[in-house]
Each structure stands twice: as structure tokens, then as C-alpha cells.
């Protein structure tokens, strides 16, 4: 029994025009690079904010100060900031120019030296700033609970700024439109 010729040649995978196959491979590579960049952004956000909280507590222990946050406040802080923003950051759209960058080595870690330095700088900045605010509030005569609430508010603010800062490894926060990622904008508000 003879078969009728296929009137649409691209339905047969052996007959797909080469340019169509190549364009789908290129778009797949580009999407993979965007996904990898978003994984790096989420890792940077989570590690830097977690390290900032550790710095805050280490400074309090080192100076024999009262704990700047209660455990329930720390849990609430992580739920409000990291629980929403990391998911929204995973949907960050392409920054553009992914295909102009050279391919990365398969041996290159997600958390490389540059990210380690950025994480250390931002974690130290956030942790020291929050501890300084706590120390100043206590020194000004604030009650301990009021000072803790102030530190909690400050950490929420700092971690919201850090979420915006995590959106790009190469572009400054103020140069990025907040409307490019409406999920992150809503999650931050």
C-alpha cells in the first residue's frame, strides 16, 4: 500500500529545515542561560540575607548585647522577605545579551568568587547597619522590645533593597525598572 506524500514537510523530523532547527537550539540555549542567571540571583539573595542575619547575631554575642531579634521575629522576617521574593526573583526576565556572553565552563560553580565577595560585602553592610541601629536605640534609652521592633523593620527594609539589588549582577539597582518584574514588585510591597 502506498502512502501519499506529506504535504507539510516540517511535520517529518527528518525533513525539518535546518534554519528552524538551529533557531530552536539557539533559543533553548538562551533560555538555559536566563534560567542559570536566575538561579544565581536567588542563591545570592538567600545567602546574603541569611549571612546578614548571622552577622547581626554574632555582633550581639561578641559584644554581650541582648539578642537584637527574638526567634519568632527572625522566623517572621524570613517568611516575609525570603519566602516571597526568592520565588518572584526566579521569574526575572532576561537582561538581554545572554548570547553575547561566552559560554561558562561546566566546572564553574554557581557560587563563584565574585558572588562570594558581593555576598560578604552586602551581608556585612546589612548586619553591621542593623546592629548599629540596635545599639544606638538601646543607648538612646529605648525599651528592648521597641529596639527589637526597630531592628526588625530595618532588616525587612534592607532585605527588600537586597532583593532589588539581586536582580542583576552587572546593572545597578536604580537603573533597573521595577516594572520589569511585577511579581517581585508585589512581593516586596
Regions found by a protein language model. Give the residues of each.
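Cytoplasmic-side transmembrane-helix entry/capping segments in multi-pass membrane proteins
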Residues: 174-185
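Membrane-embedded transport module
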Residues: 2-174
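C-terminal substrate/ligand-recognition segments
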Residues: 189
Amino acid at each position: 500500500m502506498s502512502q501519499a506524500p506529506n504535504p507539510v514537510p516540517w511535520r517529518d523530523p527528518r525533513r525539518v529545515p535546518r534554519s528552524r532547527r538551529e533557531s530552536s537550539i539557539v533559543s533553548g540555549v538562551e533560555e538555559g542561560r536566563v534560567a542559570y542567571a536566575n538561579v544565581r540571583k536567588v542563591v545570592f539573595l538567600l545567602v546574603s540575607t541569611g549571612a546578614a542575619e548571622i552577622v547581626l547575631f554574632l555582633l550581639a554575642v561578641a559584644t554581650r548585647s541582648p539578642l537584637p531579634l527574638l526567634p519568632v521575629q527572625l522566623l517572621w522576617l524570613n517568611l516575609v522577605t525570603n519566602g516571597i521574593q526568592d520565588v518572584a526573583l526566579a521569574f526575572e526576565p532576561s537582561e538581554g545579551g545572554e548570547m553575547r556572553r561566552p559560554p561558562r565552563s561546566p566546572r564553574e560553580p554557581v557560587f563563584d568568587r565574585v558572588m562570594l565577595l558581593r555576598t560578604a560585602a552586602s551581608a556585612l553592610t546589612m548586619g553591621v547597619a542593623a546592629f548599629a541601629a540596635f545599639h544606638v536605640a538601646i543607648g538612646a534609652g529605648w525599651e528592648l522590645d521597641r529596639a527589637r521592633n526597630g531592628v526588625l523593620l530595618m532588616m525587612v527594609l534592607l532585605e527588600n533593597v537586597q532583593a532589588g539589588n539581586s536582580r542583576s549582577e552587572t546593572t545597578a539597582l536604580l537603573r533597573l525598572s521595577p516594572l520589569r518584574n511585577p511579581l517581585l514588585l508585589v512581593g516586596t510591597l
